Amino acid sequence: MPGFLYSYKKFREEVEIPAVQNSDEDAMKRLQKMIRPFVLRRLKKEVLTDLPDKLEENMFVQLTGEQQKLYDAHVKRMMLMLDKQSEEEFKTSKITILAELTKLRQICCDPSLIFADYKADSAKVDMCLNMISNAVESGHKILLFSQFTTMLDHLAKRLEEEKISYYMLTGSTSKEKRAQMVENFNTDNTQVFCISLKAGGTGLNLTAADIVIHFDPWWNLAVQNQATDRAHRIGQKNVVNVYTVSYTHLRAHETGAYL
């Protein structure tokens, strides 16, 4: 419909500059209202009617022992740091705060990620390995996602101890090796594919797997869903079970941290 969005000059003056350069929400809402009748959104379940179901479940675990002590100590240190800051200091220290929240998330994954001398257990790791062992015994293939490549390295060592075969895909994996591993996983007897969420969340077809485990939840659910869709896509013949491993009763939930 030529002219529906005005001439480019008028569109730029009334929509583009206010919305893009000035972050004018009203201008953006006006544009959305105008184009909404012309936007067709099709859901996967409407297009792929023969695609097996996707069953999602949150698996909750509690911190215990030394891991709980480290978590509490880090939260206390963060609170003291924030209490000492003025409003202006808080505005300029957001990167530092995010870094501290990342450390908190790593403690929840496995304290050994930031404390080299930590030798105690991780409740999350123990639960995850138990889930994988049970799934492997039942003949399933698993996609295991984490945002931390160091966490994937740690999980890989545990898989080796349990004599569970795996592939590993991170941002450093070459394009050629990436393609070869995907092909192999879909045809051989390898049981687990450990994947960095950012490196492997899109562009992979891994329908040999029918179990997906998100070891550390991400704040952007759409990113997690894209990762899940590496298995839940055209070519999948089985119901896909998706598990997100989280801690319960953590103060960090109140501060918006996803653990």
Task: Please name every model-derived segment.
Residues 1-45, 236-239:
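Conserved P-loop NTPase motor "coupling/switch" region that bridges the ATPase
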Residues 170, 215-218:
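Short beta->alpha connector loops at strand-helix junctions that form conserved
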Residues 248-255:
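Conserved small/polar residues in nucleotide/adenosyl-binding loops
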Residues 199, 208, 217, 236:
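Short, conserved catalytic or interaction motifs in soluble domains
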Residues 222-235:
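Conserved SF2 helicase motif VI
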Residues 77-84:
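Cytochrome P450 catalytic domain signature, combining two hallmark sequence patches
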Residues 49-72, 86-204:
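Conserved Helicase C-terminal RecA-like lobe
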Residues 204-216, 241-243:
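A short beta-strand element within the Helicase C-terminal
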